[in-house]
Amino acid sequence: HNPSGGGQDSSDHDGPKFDVGGGETGGPIYEPCEGDPKREGGARGELALSYIWIANTSQGTISKINTQTMVEEGRYIAKPLGGDPSRTSVNLHGDVAVANRNGGIAKFWANPEDCQESNGIPGIQTSSGTADILPWGEDECLAWYTELTCGSNRPAAWTRGDYSEATCGYSGAQLWTACDTDVLLLNGETGAIEQTIPGIGSFFYGGAADGEGNFWGLDTGGVGQLLRVDIDDFGVQTWPLGPIGGYGITVGPQGRPWTCGGGGVSRFNLDTETWDSVGAGGIGGCMTDGESVIWHSDGAGLLLGYDIETLQVVSQVQLPEYVHGVSVDFDGYVWGVGFTTTNAYRADPITGDVQTFDQLVGAYTYSDMTGFALNSAGSAPPPEG
C-alpha cells in the first residue's frame, strides 16, 4: 500500500490496515487457503474484490475501476433501454448488482473467467475500459438482468451467503432491493425474485444487509422510517428516523445501522432502540472502516471520520469538491464520488493524500460500491420492538 499512488509498495508508510471483521464484531474471518493468499487487511486475496463500481447515471452505464491501479477495466450498459443506474452493491466474489431508479437490476461478473458465452460470437466479448462500451446483449460479463416495473427501484444490497471452509468462500448470496413500496429478495445466481414483502414502505431510498443477511432499509417517504426485514421469516420491524433524518445508510461492524447526510451521522442503538446523532441533516452516503470510524462528507467535500462510539470527528480529509458517495476499499482508502460530475477521489485517511479518477459521466452512487461494507458488517440480536 502506497498513499502516493500506483499500488506500489512503500517502505516508509504502510498506510491504513484493517483486521477485517472477526472477534466480537461479528465480521467474517477469512482463513487463507492454499494457493489463495490472505490479502493484507484480512480479506481474501481475490483480485475481484479490488474494484469500485460507480454508476455513470447520465450515460446509463457503470464503471469497474481497479482500486489499486485506479484504472477503469470495464464499462457496462446497465439496462436494455433508458437506463437510470444509481446504487451499486458488491458481493464477496466482487460481482456487482446495479439498480436502475426507473426499474431493473443487472448483475455483472467481476472476474472475466466467470463470463459466459451468450452472444453467438466465439470467445468472450466484454468491455476493456472507459471508451469500450458494448451494445446491450453483447457484453458477456452480464450475468443476468431482471426487469422490474417500478416508479422507484433504488436500494441494492447483497447478502454474504453461506461460507464454506471446503471452498474457502461464500455461495448462495442473495440480493435485496425495493420496488416502490415492496421489498424484494432476488436469487443471486439467476436474478429470479424469491420473496416479495409487499407494501411496507413509502419511498425506499437505500438499504444495506447486516452480517446475517437481514435487510435494513431507509424509507424517506412520509414521516421517514428505518425498516428491518428478517432474512429467515421475513418479519418486518420499523422505527422513526432520528432527529436529523437520513439519506445514506450502512451497517457497521457491530451490526448497528447508520444513516447519514449533510455532514451528520446517526447511529441506531439496537439495545435501546434509540438514535445518537451528530451534525446537521442533508444528503450523501457513508461507510465505516470496519473498525472504529464512519466516513461521510459534508457539503463542501470535507471527508469526516467520526468515531463510531463517541461520535467525535477523529480524522478528516479535504477533497476538491462535494462528494455524494463515500466508500472504503479493502486497502483502507476512502473514496468519494462526485455529485453528477466526472470525478471520483481516493483519499489516504492517514496522510491526507488524494488521487483523482476523472473519466466518469454524470456519476451518482453512494452505496456499498466496493463490497467492503458487506464484508465488515456485523450482526446483533434484533430489537424486541
What are the language-model segments listed below?
Residues E31-A43, G82-V90, T126-C168, G201-G211, ...:
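Repeated scaffold domains used in trafficking and secretory/extracellular systems
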Residues T57, N100-N102, A110, A178-T181, ...:
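Short loop/turn segments immediately following the C-termini of beta-strands
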